Amino acid sequence: MNLKQEVESRKTFAIISHPDAGKTTLTEKLLYFSGAIREAGTVKGKKTGKFATSDWMKVEQERGISVTSSVMQFDYDDYKINILDTPGHEDFSEDTYRTLMAVDSAVMVIDCAKGIEPQTLKLFKVCKMRGIPIFTFINKLDRVGKEPFELLDEIEETLNIETYPMNWPIGMGQSFFGIIDRKSKTIEPFRDEENILHLNDDFELEEDHAITNDSAFEQAIEELMLVEEAGEAFDNDALLSGDLTPVFFGSALANFGVQNFLNAYVDFAPMPNARQTKEDVEVSPFDDSFSGFIFKIQANMDPKHRDRIAFMRVVSGAFERGMDVTLQRTNKKQKITRSTSFMADDKETVNHAVAGDIIGLYDTGNYQIGDTLVGGKQTYSFQDLPQFTPEIFMKVSAKNVMKQKHFHKGIEQLVQEGAIQYYKTLHTNQIILGAVGQLQFEVFEHRMKNEYNVDVVMEPVGRKIARWIENEDQITDKMNTSRSILVKDRYDDLVFLFENEFATRWFEEKFLEIKLYSLL
C-alpha cells in the first residue's frame, strides 16, 4: 500500500457529549463491533468493579467520569480508525478543545430524553468554528424520550445545522421495536429473537408480521413518509463543510444501532485533512515529508514507571520509529526511538504511522502542548493550540515541607499536561494555580497524593479574572492594587488577576495606557 492509499484509509474522530449521554458507552461498543475488545458492557462499573476501556485513570474509575482524553486505534473493514474519547465533564473543556484540534470529524452523542445539553452546545460550537463534520447519534431509544421530530427540530434550531436522519425509530421505551434504515428500507428489530423485515418502495411491509397492527409502527411509517416527501437528498458536501449532520438513532448500552452507525461513518467521514502553518502554508496529508504536532501531554499513564507521554497527530508524510525529526520550538534535532499506540492504558510500539494517526512519544520533558515536529529540511510550525482563561484560582503548597522536591515535580508535570495553569507572584514566589472549573483542582489534589505522594494545601485567592498585558514595559508597582494581583505565568508573561468585573473595568479606566487581553 502506498502513502496515498494509507492516508485515505484513516478516519480520525472525537466523541463529544454532555456527561451521562452515553459517550464512553458508545466508544466501547464501537471497539466491540470492530473486534478490538472481546467484551462489551464494561462501562459504568461502579458496582461491578469493571471499568470502561477508555476510563483508565484511577480518579475516573472511582467517579465514573472521563477527565482526560483517551486515544484508541482499531481496524474496521479496510480502514484504520483513530478515536478520541474526550472529557465529558465541563471543567475539562480546555483539554477537549485541544483534542478537537487533532481530529477530522466528530460524533455528537445526545440523550433522547434530554436533547441538547449545555456541554454539548459548547463543544458543538468549537466544532462549528473549525468546520469539523459532525455525525449525530441519538442514544437511549430503549428509554422514554422526546419524539424524533422534536429532537431533529431542537438540533436544527439550537445548533443552526441541517439534519438528515439516516434511520428512523419505531416506538421508544418499552414499546421500542427497532429502527428503519432509510437507504435499504429494512427494519432492524431491537430484540434478537426477531428477524430483519423489509419495506417496499411504498413503505409497506413485505413480510407478514404483527407489527403492522402496532400504532407505534403506523406512526413511524407516517413520520418517515413525511421525511421522504420533503425530498431533501443527502448532501455529502454539506456534511464535509459542517453544515449538515447525519442523524442515527439507537441504544449504545444495548449494542443497538451502533454497527449501522459505524458502517455509515466509514463511508461518509472525511480522510485526514490539510493543516495551515503559522507561515500560511497549507500542508497536505500526502506530502512526502513527515510533520506532526503535540496536542496533549499525559503524565503517569503507568504510575509504576512515572512515564510521560506526548500525544502527536501526524499531519503529513510517514513516521518511522528511529527517524530524526526537528522540534521547531527549539530547532533541535532528535531521534524518536520510543513511540506507542493506544487502547486506553494498553500500549504497543509503533514502527510506522501516517497522516491522521495519533501516536504517543515518550517524553523526558522536551515537549510542550502545541509543539511542531518535522522531518527533512522543513522549517514551518503549525498554528498554536488555543488556551482557555481560568476562572478559579488557588494558592497551593505542600503540607509537608520535606516533600518539596516531589511537590515541584508533580506541579511541573501536571501543568505541562495543560489541565491546570501555573502562576507565581512576583515578590514572594507563591504558586497560584488556575482552572476553568472546580473539578480540575479536585483531580489535581487526588493525583498529587496518589501519583507523587504529596498532600497539598489549597486556599482560594479571591480572584476570578485573568488578563494578560500587551505592553508589559509600562507596568509599575502602583498598579498592583488591593483588588488585583500581578503574577507571572509559566512563560514568564505578566498577568493581572482581578477580583471581579468591576475591578477589571476600574483598572482599565484608571490606567488607559495599559492594554489588557484575555485568552479564550
Swiss-Prot record:
InterPro entries: EF-G-like_DII, EFG_III/V, G_TR_CS, P-loop_NTPase, PrfC, RF3_C, RF3_dom_3_sf, RF3_GTP-bd. Disulfide bonds: none annotated. GO terms for cellular component: cytosol. Residues 8-277 form the tr-type G domain. PROSITE patterns: G_TR_1, G_TR_2. GO terms for molecular function: GTP binding; GTPase activity; translation release factor activity, codon nonspecific; translation release factor activity, codon specific. Keywords: Cytoplasm, GTP-binding, Nucleotide-binding, Protein biosynthesis. GTP binds at residues 17-24, 85-89, 139-142. Pfam families: EF-G_D2 (PF22042), GTP_EFTU (PF00009), RF3_C (PF16658). It is found in: Cytoplasm. One of its GO terms (biological process) is regulation of translational termination. It comes from the Bacteria. Belongs to the TRAFAC class translation factor GTPase superfamily. Classic translation factor GTPase family. PrfC subfamily. NCBIfam families: prfC (TIGR00503), PRK00741.1 (NF001964), small_GTP (TIGR00231). Increases the formation of ribosomal termination complexes and stimulates activities of RF-1 and RF-2. It binds guanine nucleotides and has strong preference for UGA stop codons. It may interact directly with the ribosome. The stimulation of RF-1 and RF-2 is significantly reduced by GTP and GDP, but not by GMP. PANTHER family: PEPTIDE CHAIN RELEASE FACTOR RF3. This is Peptide chain release factor 3. The lineage of its organism: Bacteria, Bacillati, Bacillota, Bacilli, Bacillales. The gene is prfC.
